[in-house]
Amino acid sequence: MDGSSHLSLIIDLSPSQWHLSAQSSNPHPLSFQTFLSHVLTFVNSHIASKHENTLAVFGALPGKSSMLYSSLDADSGNGNDPPADANSYRPFKVVNSVVTNNTQKELDLIGGLTEEPPVALVGALTKALCFINRLAHPPSGSLVDEAAASADPRILILSVSPDLAASYIPVMNSIFSAQKLKVTIDVCKVFGEETVFLQQAAHLTGGSYIYLERRDAFLQYLIMSFLPPPSLRHIIAVPRQDKVDFRAACFCHKNIVDIGFVCSVCLSIFCSPVAVCSTCRTKFPMKTLQRLNASRPAIPPANGVSNGSPRPPSARPSTGMSASLR
């Protein structure tokens, strides 16, 4: 590893999802305590790879996001350092103590919620991008050294929550920002169903998306797949996703759609033809709407008896867009 590397780690801290993940009925149950111990081992490996490596840890909690650790704050000596221990390496001791304590504090703050709001993954992703931008363009008089400013940046998302269709546009905006900053986004789906938006984030930024088949091998996945920085991945065999789900969320109902109708003016996506675009207020001819409605494929009913010719599985569009409103 020639140059330094920066890692921004985003941890999904949804209490309900981690409760489900730890159930003994799962093929490979994974508790949050075991998960966190493996994550700390992984970040220690990142720190040990090179002295100039930097680290930031963000927590995506229900309804909010928070920074749990920053190597810049640790180097500045903010008074929160753990007591010295002759039997442990100080940087490891600091990151383990700070991440564990701050995570517990954040979870205690949301413990009294009667209803769990969606996890603020987009907020954590935005904070990670802002932190990386601050590293790349440090203000005058800041504590960011030259090695940290020139570090190879990447973001690793450890996700357990399902997709939130309403966050489609903010996620895409974050992806475009990551592309502009040349930031690689890696995703490890630890528990739950596949996430459409995070698949696209990893694919569009040149990162890796891995769905854990064996959660009892979580640490091995982290070390073998996500420890090497992007600058070294062209010379090693890093697992890649075989297929990418490019479906989008409609702007009208925030649902993920297989077939979308796209406004030819502002590129807004709708699940059905509309007379007036709700985004740019463009009006479409009635003949165009009739033609698009007539061309919509027949959807088989729930009892399996179709009134028309159902599409074969291979015919499902991979882009999420099939028609344009003109």
Where are these regions (language model features)?
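Intrinsically disordered, low-complexity, Ser/Thr/Glu/Asp/Lys/Arg-enriched terminal regions and linkers
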Residues: 1-236
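P/S/T/G-enriched low-complexity
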Residues: 144-151, 174-181, 188-326
